[in-house]
């Protein structure tokens, strides 16, 4: 199984034990190596202190005297895990956080008021010297390879892209001119590390903006770069530009493996190893991509955040045990503006100081009862069982999953369907007493004599007090998901949160004429900014989606939704069906009835406050660790 994925490969003499590389998306380098990745790329090593970092103008050069021990320990950790170690070599160029001025292809003033100076020959030479110095430091630190970032709108990409490069001298205009500085960088790097040291390069196949570099030019540049490099990793988008960034860190609204089509073309054009990153969600996807000859290597980013043991589980033919990435982007600091960064399915991510990598067995097994089998309840039951406890899981519905059962049926929610299948498989593998179709009562729970009780009964769909909602052809969001193919041509959706927008998109793709009414000023206000941008782009592709924001529904009468805009303007929308998606109401009062049975009682997830999968899974796991 997965024989192509786990075949070894060489890159300029360096042997990789399989075709899977850990992309530079997070720390936990040793865990990724222990999890089976053939090579782990540490990110990011800034090239030019004061001019490179997108995090801080004071970020130290990683190979300074007092940084060397830390960087060397990264290498040693990866080697202890049985993998090769690489490091991302990065220059932010005009996007860098700086104290005085930034360097770029052209002179201009950034939106934040920072001056960008067009690089002259002296500035270029200074940058080239820093590239040489940084790559020499990487070699000396023990890295087995270097990974040059030439994509995502960073300095080399800025010179390559007409979006940024408006120069009229020998470094602007034609591709040959725009490629001069990037090629000089590659030449300096190769001369520094020597002919037998593996050099990898990441490139954006498309920048996803009209003025960006053409894919034909990307392929030609890869050919130009071939004498200096040993491998190319194909990505897409621009990191700082949110319109383009949704194609760098894709959401579940985008196709799976979105960059594979470009990587295939690059591979056919060059004679170096070609890899791809982005949306490679399952071992079978990776196996098929390599078996078809489309790429040589796959890079996993968020997939290894969701499950650092992804590779090991695939090696052992246990794909059902892989915790799937949801492509929700909650792990991405830019998406959340650094608020509540985490992983929806891996409670340890960003909480490494508090959540251990391995679940420890409890000193004394206890009886644990979990009421509710949504994502939080299922995670609580699984983790409590792995702690050695005797677990009873009670669910009033005939199936496990809670709200996941409905969300998984949405057209763009294949990742959620995989998560639901994963949790169901994990529970089936464990000797958990699962009671489906069973209404939990305080009396029933008390009869089980629990030592610890987890209340995970979730939330109910909120029905606002609008006149006429009790009429025909009115339904809540979950009903609309299940009955999507039965709905009429004209659909009005009350509520433009993420679920309401997803329902609107699904119906529009089926040809329905959809209008979304949202009280606030923007759609999907409960989603992170990247997901919101992805929804906006999808909506723009559909002329049959209409949006009314800062708008409230006043009443439903005679088959029409009567509304009022913030400025007092009124109107009425005729509909065949109306969907109410105005949020969730926590079942907190129902939860209260279970308190007093046992002192160790904890309510988790949406029954305390509707807050999504990430919070429910984290709290369910944390409950189990404390029992």
Listing of model-derived features with the role each one plays in the protein:
Residues 1-371, 375, 383-386, 390-391, ...:
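Flavin-dependent oxidoreductase catalytic cores
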Residues 393-430, 506-551, 608:
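Rossmann-like dinucleotide-binding cores of NAD(P)H-dependent redox enzymes
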Residues 294, 427-434, 470-473, 539-546, ...:
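A short helix-to-beta-strand connector/capping loop
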Residues 1-9, 349-355, 433-439, 472-478, ...:
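Short gly/ser/thr-rich secondary-structure transition/capping motifs
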Residues 232, 266, 289, 301, ...:
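Hydrophobic, well-ordered secondary-structure elements that form the walls
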Residues 240-241, 304-307, 399-401, 482, ...:
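Short gly/pro/ser/thr-enriched loop/turn and capping motifs at secondary-structure boundaries
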């Amino acid at each position: 199984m997965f024989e192509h994925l786990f075949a070894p490969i060489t890159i300029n003499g360096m042997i990789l034990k399989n075709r899977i590389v850990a992309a530079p998306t997070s720390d936990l380098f040793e865990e990724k190596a222990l999890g089976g990745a053939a090579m782990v790329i540490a990110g990011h090593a800034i090239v030019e202190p004061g001019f490179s970092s997108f995090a801080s103008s004071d970020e130290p050069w990683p190979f300074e005297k007092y940084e060397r021990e830390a960087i060397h320990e990264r290498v040693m950790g990866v080697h202890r895990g049985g993998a090769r170690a690489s490091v991302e070599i990065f220059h932010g160029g005009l996007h860098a956080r700086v104290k005085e001025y930034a360097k770029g292809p052209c002179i201009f003033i950034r939106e934040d008021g920072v001056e960008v100076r067009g690089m002259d020959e002296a500035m270029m030479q200074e940058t080239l010297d820093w590239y040489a110095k940084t790559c020499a430091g990487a070699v000396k630190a023990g890295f087995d390879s270097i990974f040059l970032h030439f994509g995502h709108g960073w300095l080399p990409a800025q010179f390559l892209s007409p979006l940024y490069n408006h120069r009229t001298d020998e470094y602007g205009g034609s591709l040959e001119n725009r490629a001069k500085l990037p090629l000089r960088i590659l030449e300096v790097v190769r001369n520094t590390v020597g002919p037998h040291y593996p050099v990898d390069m990441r490139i954006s196949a498309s920048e996803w903006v009209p003025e960006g570099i053409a894919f034909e030019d990307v392929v030609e540049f890869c050919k130009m770069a071939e004498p200096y490099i040993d491998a190319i990793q194909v990505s897409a988008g621009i990191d700082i530009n949110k319109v383009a960034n949704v194609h760098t860190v894709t959401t579940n609204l985008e196709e799976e493996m979105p960059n594979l089509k470009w990587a295939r073309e690059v591979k056919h054009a060059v004679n170096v190893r070609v890899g791809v990153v982005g949306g490679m969600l399952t071992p079978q996807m990776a196996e098929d991509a390599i078996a078809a000859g489309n790429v040589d290597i796959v890079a996993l980013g968020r997939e290894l955040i969701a499950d650092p043991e992804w590779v090991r589980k695939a090696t052992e033919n246990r794909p059902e045990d892989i915790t799937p990435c949801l492509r929700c982007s909650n792990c991405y600091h830019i998406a959340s503006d650094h608020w509540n960064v985490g992983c929806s399915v891996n409670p340890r991510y960003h909480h490494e100081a508090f959540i251990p990598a391995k679940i420890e067995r409890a000193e004394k097994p206890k009886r644990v009862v979990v009421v509710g089998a949504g994502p939080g309840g299922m995670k609580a039951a699984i983790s409590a069982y792995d702690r050695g406890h005797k677990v009873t899981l009670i669910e009033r519905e005939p199936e496990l999953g809670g709200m996941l059962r409905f969300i998984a049926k949405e057209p763009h929610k294949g990742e959620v369907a995989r998560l639901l299948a994963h949790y169901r498989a994990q529970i089936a593998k464990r000797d958990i007493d699962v009671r489906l179709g069973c209404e939990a009562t305080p009396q029933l729970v008390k009869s089980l004599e629990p030592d610890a009780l987890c209340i995970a009964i979730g939330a109910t769909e909120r029905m606002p007090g609008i006149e006429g909602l009790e009429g025909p052809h009115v339904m809540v969001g979950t009903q609309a998901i299940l009955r999507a193919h039965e709905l009429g041509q004209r659909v009005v959706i009350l509520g433009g949160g993420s679920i309401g927008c997803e329902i609107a998109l699904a119906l529009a793709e089926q040809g329905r004429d959809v209008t979304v009414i949202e009280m606030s000023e923007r759609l999907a206000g409960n989603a992170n900014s990247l997901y919101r941008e992805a929804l906006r782009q999808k909506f723009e592709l559909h002329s049959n989606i209409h949006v009314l924001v800062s708008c409230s529904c006043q009443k439903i009468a005679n088959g029409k939704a009567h509304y009022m805009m913030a400025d007092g303007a009124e109107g009425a929308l005729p509909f065949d069906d109306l969907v109410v998606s105005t949020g969730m109401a926590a079942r907190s009062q129902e939860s209260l009835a279970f308190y007093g049975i046992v002192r160790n009682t904890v309510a988790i997830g949406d029954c305390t406050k509707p807050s999504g999968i990430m919070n429910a899974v984290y709290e369910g796991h944390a409950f189990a660790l404390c029992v």
